[in-house]
């Protein structure tokens, strides 16, 4: 039994499932999760000292790679001034100034502690601002673990929400309408049925929790038009895509303007930070200037703000996003070429610094139902074959992979070579 296995056995007696977030338990792929000792650049080192090329990146935040010296130094300096004050700081102002300068649709922003807090707060704000209760989300999209968002879709294009987890009252879920991602007709049907009751649409502009599903041409723009037509707000959940597919987020990349935007992951530079923001008239409805309540003891934490500010300044440089996209393109093309050589049917979706690997003979993967038709068992085998060769992919067929600026062409080539070897064993 190695150290990770020993730690996992101990953890299971103290922490539910041995982990503090379910996907880390390797439930989707089987086996024992790695316990990580340290990380640097594009590499993780487990409790037994084995190194891995990392494509999880702490589930998205590590766009600069692990333990980046600029972020590390900023955090050390901030810690020296105090861990938390419970009062406003200049860094909060500087951070808000930077974020609103980078995201064109955000006139104002409020900091929170996680992506879940950001989406939960944005939806409350949308409901309060519009005076309506219902919201539209999309099958296969994840927006955190707030009660009204843990909803699954039933049959048909339009489904009144049913709880997706015990502990979520049906009365909470009934206001959540689930439509099909990349299917505007399902959204039109929802608005036709509830024309005066829908407060908002919330959408991942690139769906990253059914692996990686980009929007079809016109999909996001169609959502914008429907919101305008029916007086609803468009919330773009950029917790995953913000500062990853483009400096101005996926909304810049796909040229769509939301009313509210949710941010997380990269905005914290590896620290727990979320944010939501948007049109001034909507944001000013928040307390203390407006009646809609939202608060947080550690929101705008000075250490977290220092990390996020340092990270955003580092990526706000010429050439960063072309470099990130080139690395991702090279990986995707190499994986597809290796799969063709070994006659393994494969689709690789990728946008900016995100990618998704699908074992399928479908020509494309564009929605949740397409994802369900992929070969999850083959992915499990592939994951472990890659792990044995020192390549750490997301331990789930439903999670996107992430590139960092710390990955080298040598890392990419090693990954492609490992994939070729793995594909040969999957026949």
Curated annotation (Swiss-Prot):
Q: What is this protein called?
A: Glutamate-1-semialdehyde 2,1-aminomutase
Q: Which domain of life is it from?
A: Bacteria
Q: Which family does it belong to?
A: Belongs to the class-III pyridoxal-phosphate-dependent aminotransferase family. HemL subfamily.
Gene that specifies this protein = hemL
Sequence positions bearing N6-(pyridoxal phosphate)lysine: 265
For this UniProt record, give its keywords in alphabetical order, as a comma-separated list.
Cytoplasm, Isomerase, Porphyrin biosynthesis, Pyridoxal phosphate
Q: Which organism is it from?
A: Edwardsiella ictaluri (strain 93-146)
Q: Where mainly found?
A: cytoplasm
Indicate yes or no for the key word Isomerase.
yes
Q: What is its EC number?
A: 5.4.3.8
GO cellular component term of the entry, any: cytoplasm
* InterPro entries documented for this protein: 4pyrrol_synth_GluAld_NH2Trfase, Aminotrans_3, Aminotrans_3_PPA_site, PyrdxlP-dep_Trfase, PyrdxlP-dep_Trfase_major, PyrdxlP-dep_Trfase_small
- Disulfide connectivity? none
Q: Where in the cell is it found?
A: Cytoplasm
Oligomeric state and interaction partners are given as:
Homodimer.
Q: What class of enzyme is it?
A: isomerase
Q: Does the keyword Isomerase apply?
A: yes
Reactions mediated catalytically:
(S)-4-amino-5-oxopentanoate = 5-aminolevulinate
Name any cofactors this protein relies on: pyridoxal 5'-phosphate
């Amino acid at each position: 039994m190695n150290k990770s296995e020993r730690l996992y056995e101990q953890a299971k007696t103290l922490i539910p499932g041995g982990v503090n977030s379910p996907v880390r338990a390797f439930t989707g792929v089987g086996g024992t999760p790695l316990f990580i000792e340290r990380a640097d650049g594009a590499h993780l080192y487990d409790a037994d000292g084995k190194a891995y090329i990392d494509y999880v990146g702490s589930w998205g935040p590590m766009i600069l790679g692990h333990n980046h010296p600029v972020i590390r130094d900023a955090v050390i300096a901030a810690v020296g001034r105090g861990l938390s004050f419970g009062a406003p700081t200049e860094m909060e102002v500087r951070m808000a100034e930077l974020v609103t300068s980078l995201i064109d649709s955000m006139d104002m922003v409020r900091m929170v502690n996680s992506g879940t807090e950001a989406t939960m707060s944005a939806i409350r704000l949308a409901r309060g601002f519009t005076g309506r209760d219902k919201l539209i989300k999309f099958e296969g999209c994840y927006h955190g673990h707030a009660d009204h968002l843990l909803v699954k879709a039933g049959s048909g294009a339009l489904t009144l929400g049913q709880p997706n987890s015990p502990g979520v009252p049906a009365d909470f879920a009934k206001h959540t309408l689930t439509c099909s991602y990349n299917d505007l007709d399902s959204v039109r049907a929802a608005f036709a049925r509830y024309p005066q009751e829908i407060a908002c649409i919330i959408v991942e502009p690139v769906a990253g929790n059914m692996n990686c599903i980009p929007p079809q041409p016109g999909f996001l723009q169609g959502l914008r038009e429907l919101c305008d037509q029916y007086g609803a707000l468009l919330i773009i959940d950029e917790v995953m895509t913000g500062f990853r597919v483009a400096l101005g987020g996926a909304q810049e990349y796909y040229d769509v303007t939301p009313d509210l935007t949710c941010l997380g992951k990269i905005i914290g530079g590896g620290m727990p930070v979320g944010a939501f923001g948007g049109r001034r008239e909507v944001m000013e409805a928040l307390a203390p200037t407006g009646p809609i309540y939202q608060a947080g003891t550690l929101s705008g934490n000075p250490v977290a703000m220092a990390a996020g500010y340092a990270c955003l300044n580092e990526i706000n440089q010429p050439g960063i996003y072309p470099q990130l996209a080139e690395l991702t393109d090279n990986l995707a093309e190499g994986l597809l070429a290796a799969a063709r050589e070994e006659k393994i049917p494969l689709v690789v979706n990728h946008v900016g610094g995100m990618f998704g690997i699908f074992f399928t003979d479908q020509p494309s993967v564009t929605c949740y139902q397409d994802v369900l038709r992929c070969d999850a068992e083959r992915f499990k085998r592939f994951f472990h074959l890659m792990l044995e060769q020192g390549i750490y992919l997301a331990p789930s067929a439903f999670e996107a992979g992430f590139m960092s600026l710390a990955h080298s062409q040598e890392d990419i080539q090693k990954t492609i070579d490992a994939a070729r070897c793995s594909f040969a064993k999957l026949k």
